[in-house]
UniProtKB/Swiss-Prot annotation:
More details: Gene duplication of the ancestral BCNT gene leads to the h-type BCNT (CFDP1) gene and the p97BCNT (CFDP2) gene. The latter contains a region derived from the endonuclease domain of a retrotransposable element RTE-1. This repetitive sequence associated with the BCNT gene is specific to Ruminantia.
Pfam families (alphabetical): BCNT
Tissues where this protein is expressed: Brain.
Span list, region Hydrophilic: 176-215
PANTHER family for this protein: CRANIOFACIAL DEVELOPMENT PROTEIN 1
Record InterPro entries: BCNT-C (IPR011421), Swc5/CFDP1/2 (IPR027124)
Region Disordered, residue ranges: 1-157, 190-222
Record protein name field: Craniofacial development protein 1
Keyword Oxidoreductase found: no
Annotated keywords: Developmental protein, Isopeptide bond, Methylation, Phosphoprotein, Ubl conjugation
Cross-link (Glycyl lysine isopeptide (Lys-Gly) (interchain with G-Cter in SUMO2)): K148
Length: 297
């Protein structure tokens, strides 16, 4: 047994160390090696084909994605165009509906007006001439009202009359020309005086003239003339003469408005005095009213 075991061990070692040469291969071994090479080549070709297929599939997927994106863009554009076209159609339909509603409303108004005219009858039909006349009448009335309003607004401008008065100042004759209203008392008295002083020569004599020998008539005529000549003129005081000179100077120089504006200011003595007088008078009236109210039971 021990020998057998040693032999077996030796044979096993020999088997491990033994390497067959190429000439010692059998046909079956060669066929198996060829098949293994072919299998390895097929696996490599399959691997390369798999990688190619993977690349092609990736490209195809990318193309498909690009196509999908393009298709999506086209669909969005189509949707937008469809939406705009639908909006235009809606606007057109709304416009058409509005026109139809306006037409229907006008038609309804015409029908109502026709029915109203039928109910009223021929009395409502008035000839156009009457309308024109009424329009003219209204225009005339409106114009007359406007004229009346203007007359009321505009105060009546009174006519001015120049009168001349003769005064005696220190033996000199002074003529004063004043411009007053025609309806004033001063103007009326001046006109009456002029009518009285008119010579009676313009008036035709009602009684035949007496002979020249009558001394009474001649004496009366001479006395009237002497009376007119020797009539006393109205005397003028120094204050009146200075006032007259000042007024004439203002008119010649044209400083009346400037003086009036100056007197209305703070430096105007006359205006200030008048204002203070008005204040005193108003204060007196208030005190009087208070006293009277206290005196009443």
């Amino acid at each position: 047994m021990e020998e057998f075991d040693s032999e077996d061990f030796s044979t096993s070692e020999e088997d491990e160390d033994y390497v067959p040469s190429g000439g010692e291969y059998s046909e079956d071994d060669i066929n198996e090696l060829v098949k293994e090479d072919e299998v390895d080549g097929e696996e490599e070709t399959q691997k390369t084909k798999g990688t190619k297929r993977k690349a092609e599939s990736v490209l195809a997927r990318k193309r498909k994605q690009g196509g999908l994106s393009l298709e999506e863009d086209e669909e969005d554009a189509n949707e937008e165009s469809g939406g705009s076209s639908s909006e235009e159609e809606d606007a057109a339909t709304e416009q058409q509906k509005g026109v139809e509603s306006e037409d229907a409303r006008k038609k309804k108004e015409d029908e109502l007006w026709a029915s109203f005219l039928n109910d009223v009858g021929p009395k409502s039909k008035v000839p156009p001439s009457t309308h024109v006349k009424t329009g003219e009448e209204t225009e005339e009335t409106s114009s007359s009202h406007l004229v009346k309003a203007e007359r009321l607004e505009k105060p009546k401008e009174t006519e001015k009359v120049k009168i001349t008065k003769v005064f005696d100042f220190a033996g000199e004759e002074v003529r004063v020309i004043k411009e007053v209203d025609a309806t004033s008392k001063e103007a009326k008295s001046f006109f009456k005086q002029n009518e009285k002083e008119k010579p009676q020569s313009n008036v035709p004599p009602a009684v035949p003239s007496l002979p020249a020998g009558s001394g009474l008539k001649r004496s009366s005529g001479m006395s009237s003339l002497l009376g007119k000549i020797g009539a006393k003129k109205q005397k003028m005081s120094t204050l009146e003469k200075s006032k007259l000179d000042w007024e004439s100077f203002k008119e010649e120089e044209g400083i009346g408005e400037e003086l009036a504006i100056h007197n209305r200011g703070k430096e105007g003595y006359i205006e200030r005095k008048a204002f203070l007088d008005r204040v005193d008078h108003r204060q007196f009236e208030i005190e009087r009213d208070l006293r009277l109210s206290k005196m009443k039971p």
